[in-house]
A protein has these predicted regions:
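A cross-kingdom feature marking solvent-exposed beta-strand/loop segments within repeated
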Residues: 30, 69-75, 114-142, 198, ...
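Short extracytoplasmic
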Residues: 41-67
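Positively charged n-region of N-terminal signal peptides that target proteins for export
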Residues: 1-5
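Extended non-catalytic domains of envelope/secretory-pathway proteins
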Residues: 185-188, 207-208, 248-250, 256-357, ...
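Ser/Thr/Pro/Gly-rich low-complexity linker/stalk segments immediately outside membranes or between
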Residues: 22-44
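Leucine-rich, highly hydrophobic segment in Treponema pallidum outer-membrane-associated proteins
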Residues: 16-18, 174-283, 287-290, 427-492
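Single conserved position on a long alpha-helix in the C-terminal lobe of the eukaryotic protein kinase
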Residues: 45, 79-183, 324-425
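Hydrophobic membrane-insertion alpha-helices, especially the h-region
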Residues: 7-22
């Protein structure tokens, strides 16, 4: 073989081998902290600190300020742990909380603990079983070596001695023994946000567990996990949530709902009222939606009541396409107005139900509590209990509202400035909702004073998106250029 060709082949082989070795070392380094996470953990959170700070546009100075804030000391220049590698938090099957991080300088970490000791927040470092140890605020036990650090608790007294033994086992376990080899962790690995989490539904707070069981119609949360991802996009804080289950009945229910809530076409986006407090949209076939509504006792009773005057079932069966609901103000809730500022719009397959309008009017006339009037062959007003409801059809779109102003508003498509940024994203989703939170937070602040909800005033609205049933995205949307994440974290 030609010596030149041989040299090229050897060089290429060495380059490939070197690349593989470097990649393996980087992977090994990146996963050092993961090696201390137990395989039996019921919840795991992964935090990519530098990615999060980069996405939130933190400067070096602001990043340093955040570290000092977290370490409760202005004297700390570097944390001693590698913030370019993931930090893991977890909950054990016994309910212990833990945090694992990769160490990049054990001496710096020890020095930082000495600063905390001088402030009365940590005990003097002692060496035991091959690791350095310190108790932070008496109930959080920390151990570290040159590779990784582990913090666990809360625990005191004899329980802390038992925890120390458990921590030694976690620090010494192999890759095969840690969470990295568990199917549970694989769900977390699929999340690419700078902050990601996977949790067994059973470890959630009782209130949330009860709500989930009620909404999912299950008697147990066994074999149900929630995967979460949090990231920032300019002036948006985004949370992605996935419901993961092996329960056969629940999987079938989610599949059925996926068939009912079809991809949104965007047919009614331009009709959103610019003053909408709440706006929702989905795409359904009326007959399937009616079957779903009848499964809920309260809604089934309400439908029976509506059908005594108007054939609401027939009206609903004609729906085929995008459906929107909107609430334009809090006036009704506060008792300032008797008219309900809510409107429903729905694309129709047909208008056959209008053929029953003469029968509706006769039925209402025979019922003293109701009065039904037709302003046009396709527009009606129903009066009952000193209230009124307007409904009808315009351009093959059904409208139903409790407000005369919304009933008389232009029902044809007219471009407006509302939801301009989201308009292209709405198409293809199975559900979308947008809530203007400014009026709500101002109202709460007015009557309740300062509360943790004041932070919501930094945002304009909250959007809820559903791709497939079981996958949700919540977006907190702030004014452009507001640096909302910095304001929340640094308190600016």
């Amino acid at each position: 073989m030609n010596k030149k060709i041989l040299s090229i082949l050897i060089g290429a082989a060495l380059a490939i081998a070197g690349g593989i070795t470097a990649y393996s070392l980087m992977r090994s380094h990146a996963d050092v902290a993961l090696a201390s996470v137990p395989k039996t953990a019921t919840a795991i959170v992964r935090l990519d600190v530098m990615t999060f700070l980069h996405d939130a546009d933190f400067s070096t100075k602001e990043g340093k300020q955040l570290i000092q804030q977290l370490m409760q000391s202005e004297n700390i220049e570097q944390p001693g742990v590698d913030l370019n590698s993931p930090v893991y938090a977890f909950i054990t099957e016994n309910g212990d909380f833990g945090v694992s991080a990769t160490v990049d300088d054990a001496d710096v970490l020890a020095e930082n603990l000495s600063h905390l000791m001088q402030q009365g927040h940590a005990t003097a470092i002692e060496k035991q079983r091959g690791f350095q140890w310190s108790a932070i605020d008496q109930k959080w036990l920390m151990c570290f070596d040159d590779d990784k650090a582990l913090l666990m608790g809360p625990s005191v007294g004899a329980a802390q001695d038992a925890l120390r033994t458990k921590m030694v086992g976690l620090m010494q376990q192999s890759t095969k023994e840690c969470a990295a080899s568990s199917p549970f962790y694989m769900h977390l690995k699929e999340k690419h946000e700078p902050i990601a989490a996977i949790a067994e539904a059973d470890v959630l707070p009782n209130d949330i567990r009860e709500m989930l069981m009620k909404q999912l119609k299950v008697s147990s949360l066994e074999d149900i996990q929630l995967a979460l991802g949090l990231g920032t996009q300019k002036d948006v804080v985004r949370i992605d949530a996935d419901l993961i289950t092996e329960q056969a009945d629940l999987k079938q229910r989610l599949t059925d709902l996926n068939a009912i809530f079809r991809p949104i076409k965007g047919q009614l986006v331009n009709r959103a009222d610019e003053s909408s407090l709440l706006w929702t949209v989905c795409n359904v076939k009326g007959e399937q939606l009616l079957e779903l509504l009848r499964k809920f006792p309260n809604l089934r009773t309400a439908l029976i009541g509506l059908n005594t005057i108007v054939d609401f079932d027939l009206m609903l069966k004609a729906v085929d396409g995008d459906v929107t609901t909107e609430c334009t103000s809090l006036s009704f809730v506060l008792g300032w107005k008797r008219q309900l500022p809510v409107r429903l719009l729905a694309c129709l397959d047909n208008e056959d139900f209008l053929k029953q309008s003469d029968y509706w009017i006769k039925s209402a006339a025979a019922t003293p509590a109701y009065e039904l009037m037709a302003s046009t062959p396709k527009d009606f007003v129903l009066a009952f209990d000193e209230r009124q409801a307007w409904f009808g059809v315009k351009d093959k779109v059904l409208y139903l509202t409790g407000s005369s102003s919304l009933a008389n508003a232009d029902k044809a498509s007219a471009p407006n400035a509302y939801l301009v940024g989201e308009r292209s994203e709405i198409k293809g989703l199975r559900f979308f909702a947008s809530l203007d939170i400014q009026p709500l937070t101002v109202l709460i602040s007015t009557f309740a004073g300062s509360t943790p909800l004041d932070r919501l005033l930094l945002f304009q609205r909250i959007n809820l998106e559903m791709g497939d049933v079981g996958h949700f995205t919540i977006k907190f949307v702030a004014p452009e250029g507001s640096d909302v994440v910095k304001k929340i974290i640094l308190g600016k």
